[in-house]
Amino acid sequence: MCIRDRLRTPAVWVLAAASAFMYISRYAINGWGVLFLQEAKGFSDVEAISVVSINALLGILGTVLSGWFSDKLFKGDRKIPALLFGILNSVALALFLYGGNAMWVNVLSMVLFGIAIGVLICFLGGLMAVDIVPRKATGAALGVVGIASYIAAGIQDVASGWLIDSHITVATDGAKHYDFGPVALFWIAASVISFLLPLMNRKQKTEA
């Protein structure tokens, strides 16, 4: 089977879609997390930036540990840790969005979110793609997943901006009040879809 035929297999595109939805949640926090903390929770600029930056630092740890998680704890099975860290991603995002204003809660949410995203980037964007295609097709498969992910990140930015802007109310004194409810549901839904989609590849890989 040629590379083109391999890339036509549903498993590659399911994985690309899963990674794309994961990137929506990832860049939602990186792009809009500071504004959310400022407007929804009353954090100062320094506080908001400091909290959101934690997830990037912990993402490095998640990336470093991702191979160890799958190889040592799960004997090379990527699906189980991808599911577990996908759920952790959604839980951390929900904690960030709905967990209240306490500093420690928001710091904890970004610690968990960063670790989860770091692991998922390696799994959905790399290791799982390598697992489902022959070695000669891995570059093409990674390219498909990467392109889908960054297209989704761009769409997220536009969609999130529209959802946020369309739910701003202006008081008589000119003060703006943000309703992050709709965009928060969009981000949560994307994170949930991202960990459900790879489950569809179980049967397909068995038949390959």
Regions found by a protein language model. Give the residues of each.
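C-terminal ends and interior cores of transmembrane alpha-helices
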Residues: 87-101
